[in-house]
């Protein structure tokens, strides 16, 4: 615990907490000051000027990061017949129908990171709403995980597709890579994410859309990014 405290304090000294950095400067700094013995994940935390309590101010979607996230996601696909074969050929880790519902319900099995379903299977998948929903695993058309084009969905996920959505405090939390990516690749991933979030701005949103942006590694301090420069 003391080691972590010293490491964190040392990293914190290198961050100007009164400054709003440009994205490339901030992400290079996050990468440079990371000191853990593992390859830390870098996350972006974006506070938006919307009210998630209103249906017309929801912000949700997905974007393929140009350099991926540094993690290979395990994909479970609910499909039957030809679509099940397509999913297997595309590299899905698990493919099935009712038997997977029973496995999840009966064994509390969650050895997967994302769920894709063909539209005709949503009646079956809906039975898992109470267990998949709280874990953020429920397939959704807005994120491209309810589709008949299962091969495309799997390809995008394996290539580094990430989902983004508001939490109850109107903040989006999304990984943009690993510290080993370095500043340039992290910045390119971050830019792709921000472009998608800006395009997803609800028509009902009033005032400043990007309220605050912070990036940080798993064990490191937050570095603030200038939201005005990001929106340009």
Swiss-Prot record:
Which biological processes are named by the entry's GO terms?
regulation of translation; translation
The protein's superkingdom reads Bacteria
Query: What Gene3D superfamilies does its record include?
Result: 3.30.190.20, 3.40.50.790
Entry similarity comment: Belongs to the universal ribosomal protein uL1 family.
Stretches of the chain forming a coiled coil according to its record: none
Which SUPFAM superfamilies does the protein's record reference?
Ribosomal protein L1 (SSF56808)
The question of whether rRNA-binding is a record keyword is answered with yes
How does the record describe its quaternary structure?
Answer: Part of the 50S ribosomal subunit.
GO cellular component terms, A-Z: large ribosomal subunit
Q: What's this chain's function?
A: Binds directly to 23S rRNA. The L1 stalk is quite mobile in the ribosome, and is involved in E site tRNA release.
* Protein's UniProt name: Large ribosomal subunit protein uL1
Entry's Gene Ontology molecular function annotations: rRNA binding; structural constituent of ribosome; tRNA binding
Signal peptide residues are: none
What keywords does the record list, in alphabetical order? Repressor, Ribonucleoprotein, Ribosomal protein, RNA-binding, rRNA-binding, Translation regulation, tRNA-binding
Its taxonomic placement starts with: Bacteria, Bacillati, Bacillota, Clostridia, Peptostreptococcales
